[in-house]
UniProtKB/Swiss-Prot annotation:
Protein name: Uncharacterized protein R354
Organism field: Acanthamoeba polyphaga mimivirus (APMV)
Pfam families recorded: YqaJ
Taxonomy, superkingdom: Viruses
Length: 549
């Protein structure tokens, strides 16, 4: 049987013709293997084509090291394979290095040693194409190799003007008083403004709500918020997303609560985070002032292609980010989307451990970890399982990339010392949840200030309507009855009524009714809604016809 060194030499020749000294990505790997295999098989068919592919995979992955490509401007997660080096030289067909250790190691391996490649592939799991991107060209031998240093700022003080401006603005934001949650001041602040999550609705560019819903809510007559599985899932894992982003980008991420625009107090936003200094050394970062918005979709697919506004980032989230940028007076936001899986057991969690890097999933090559779920004592035994879940609170680990032993010690410590936790009076430990990230995308969104400011007059008029009905509860009661009659999706008729009401007591106003024409986004949503309705109608008709016959 032909020795492995023979195939090593043949593969080298073909790779040089295809790649030269270039690299290839994970997405190109299968095509590369097929090309090399088909070429060799034309003149040497001693082994089957399938076994030949296994040999080629083995040889190539011994010659190339895995690197990560991280670029916030990119919509793709990629893995890059770059030629391994010996000393300071690159191994390749034209290499003059006399000490080519990697090739010598391959040469002494027999075909029987890699029988179908099974043992080797078990030891060296491939990196998933869903891997979070990293610009740093490093072999991952430790979790610290996962940190991107792309955004580290090398100087002791900021020199570039845009970093100086962001840092100065961040200092101002840090000094803004933050009120205790649920306090009178906290509640009052929320009644004084339209928050970022409401802006898409006020623009009539939200698929789920119509503008009148926000107006009634701001007048204290809206439906009470009821948490659902989608909101709870996002809130539950938001801190994990922050920890992941902070670690991978070597940056501290701070939370600053609800912020109001300096000139338009009726517009407010609360970003998930704002970046500041480097996390590991406290030095400067080029990410200073960049906002972070995190989404953990419960069922929505994460899209990596198409338009940033609408396809990759759903339009209502895009407007949320634009509002956050406008309010904070920053210019960039990273939109981080993560898919997360929960393990069924500790045993499954342990089995899925990366053999080299603690805290990485062997399956996804993304972070994994745990958190402790706490349940409300007053709801123990309740038949309302959803209410029990949505009232849960969580204890998060101090860091990512803990070894399994460290995780066990942390869980034991939290349980033993839980009586010292402030939450222990009203909450009890329910269970430990083990999770892994399965997909991560990070896309840079920049402020379009001109486009946003074009909508300020609409927001101002809408807010004037809110203030008007707050002062005239009798007219608000009549408005509610009118909305019940015409239905909340009839925005044109509702806001004609509202504008007439407003002008009756504001004779000098030049306001024209809002929402007299459908926005382009509303048209798009209505088309999608109509298609779905027709689809369900057809299904129901077919089902009826089937049973009728």
């Amino acid at each position: 049987m032909t020795d492995i060194s023979y195939y090593n030499n043949e593969i080298d020749k073909i790779l040089w013709n295809i790649l030269g000294d270039d690299y290839f990505t994970q997405d190109e790997f299968d095509d590369l293997v097929n090309s090399v295999a088909n070429t060799i098989y034309q003149y040497d068919n001693e082994v089957s084509i399938d076994k030949l592919k296994v040999i080629i995979e083995f040889v190539i992955l011994n010659k190339f090291k895995i690197c990560y490509i991280y670029d916030n401007d990119s919509i793709l997660n990629q893995v890059k394979y770059e030629k391994k080096s010996v000393g300071s030289k690159t191994i390749g067909k034209n290499s003059t290095n006399d000490d080519e250790d990697d090739d010598e190691d391959i040469a002494v391996i027999k075909l029987s040693d890699i029988e179908a490649g099974e043992n080797w592939f078990k030891k060296s799991p491939k990196i998933s194409s869903k891997q979070f991107q990293s610009v740093d060209k490093v072999e991952v031998a430790t979790y610290e190799d996962l940190i991107s240093h792309k955004h580290d700022y090398p100087k002791e003080i900021y020199k570039e003007s845009h970093y100086i401006r962001r840092n100065t603005r961040l200092d101002v934001i840090k000094k803004i008083p933050q009120f205790e949650q649920k306090s009178k001041e906290w509640l009052k602040q929320r009644t004084e403004s339209l928050t970022a999550t409401a802006i898409s609705v006020v623009f009539d560019e939200d698929p789920y709500k119509h503008p009148i819903v926000i107006l009634l809510d701001k007048c204290g007559r809206g439906l009470p918020f009821v948490e659902n599985k989608f909101v709870h899932h996002g809130n539950k894992y938001e801190q994990i997303g922050t920890m992941f982003y902070s670690f991978r980008n070597n940056v501290e991420v701070g939370e600053y609560g609800l912020l109001q625009h300096s000139g338009h107090k009726f517009i407010a936003a609360s970003p998930d985070g704002i970046c500041s200094k480097k996390a590991n050394t406290g030095g400067l970062s080029k990410l200073v002032g960049r906002l972070l918005e995190i989404k953990f979709p419960f069922s929505r697919e994460i899209n990596n292609s198409g338009d940033l506004d609408g396809d990759i980032c759903p339009h209502y989230y895009f407007l949320q980010v634009q509002t956050q940028l406008y309010v904070t007076e920053m210019d960039e936001c990273d939109f981080l989307q993560c898919k997360i899986d929960e393990y069924d057991s500790w045993e499954d969690f342990v089995k899925d451990s990366n053999p080299i890097v603690p805290g990485l999933s062997k399956t996804t090559n993304l972070e994994k970890g745990c958190l402790i779920q706490l349940s409300d004592k007053n709801l123990i035994g309740s038949d309302d399982k959803e209410k029990c879940l949505y009232n849960s609170k969580y204890i998060y680990p101090p860091k990512l990339h803990m070894t399994n032993e460290e995780i066990e010690k942390w869980i034991s410590s939290e349980i033993m010392n839980y009586h010292n936790n402030d939450l222990s009076e009203n909450y009890m430990i329910d269970r430990v949840i083990y999770w892994r990230l399965s997909q991560v995308t990070c896309n840079l969104i920049k402020l379009n200030k001109e486009a946003f400011e074009e909508k300020i007059p609409l927001l101002q008029q809408f807010w004037d309507y809110v203030l008007f009905y707050r002062q005239h509860s009798d007219k608000l009661d009549k408005l509610i009855k009118f909305v019940e009659k015409v239905k909340e999706d009839n925005s044109a008729e509702i806001f004609s009524y509202i504008n007439e009401d407003f002008l009756s007591l504001n004779k000098d106003s030049k306001y024209e009714p809002l929402y007299q024409e459908e926005t382009e986004w509303r048209k798009k949503y209505n088309q999608i809604k109509a298609k779905k309705a027709q689809m369900y109608k057809n299904k129901s008709y077919n089902k009826y016809t089937k049973f009728s016959n």
